[in-house]
């Protein structure tokens, strides 16, 4: 069942009147958690590089877990961060892999959204390579308003006031308006 946003018209009017309040994509992060180092991690790295055209970085285990045979500091995942037009184009392809449907629970209180893709071959334009195999991935989309740089810059750093932060509803509305995403309730 699609989710409706109660104050939809009010938010859209605010974005129209104040362009600095309209959200934008800060970054798209694609993560493949392999759970082991070695050949499988290298294959995931190759696949992610082919998919994004960018060199992935390896993520290391934070803790030792004997049940899974993981040591602290051992590389167990690969990640790519995309920004700008590249992030926008990649997000369109990734959303097509999930049929432009996202769960309402995938959004956090700041309007950011994360979703999973079970098999990378579901992404349009990706061919199956028997040498590499099939990988799933987590996709996190971080949204922001123009002006958020003041919280990250080195000099004259300032806090973002609560009224300028994004809400969950605004994040949902942005994804619906910009990408034509359908937001569904969980069946329970």
Curated annotation (Swiss-Prot):
InterPro entries assigned: Ribosomal_uL5, Ribosomal_uL5_arc, Ribosomal_uL5_C, Ribosomal_uL5_dom_sf, Ribosomal_uL5_N
GO CC annotation terms, alphabetical: ribonucleoprotein complex; ribosome
Molecular function per GO: rRNA binding; structural constituent of ribosome; tRNA binding
Protein family per UniProt: Belongs to the universal ribosomal protein uL5 family.
HAMAP family for this protein: Ribosomal_uL5_A
PANTHER family noted in UniProt: 60S RIBOSOMAL PROTEIN L11-RELATED (PTHR11994)
Protein name per its UniProtKB record: Large ribosomal subunit protein uL5
Gene: rpl5
């Amino acid at each position: 069942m699609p989710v409706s946003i109660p104050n939809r018209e009010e938010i859209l009017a605010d974005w129209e009147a104040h362009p600095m309040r309209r959200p934008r994509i800060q970054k798209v992060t694609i993560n493949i958690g392999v759970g082991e180092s070695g050949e499988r991690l290298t294959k995931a790295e190759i696949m992610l590089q082919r998919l994004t055209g960018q060199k992935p970085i390896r993520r290391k285990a934070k803790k030792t877990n004997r049940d899974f045979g993981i040591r602290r500091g051992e590389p167990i995942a690969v990640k790519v961060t995309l920004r700008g037009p590249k992030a926008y184009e990649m997000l369109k392809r990734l959303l097509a892999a999930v049929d432009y449907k996202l769960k309402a629970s995938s959004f956090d209180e700041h309007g950011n959204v994360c979703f999973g893709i079970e098999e990378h071959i579901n992404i349009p334009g990706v061919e199956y390579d028997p040498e590499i195999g099939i990988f799933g991935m987590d996709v996190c989309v971080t949204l922001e308003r123009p002006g958020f740089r003041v919280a990250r810059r080195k000099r004259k750093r300032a806090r973002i006031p609560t009224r300028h932060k994004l809400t969950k509803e605004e994040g949902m509305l942005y994804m619906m308006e910009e990408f034509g995403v359908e937001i569904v309730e969980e069946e329970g």
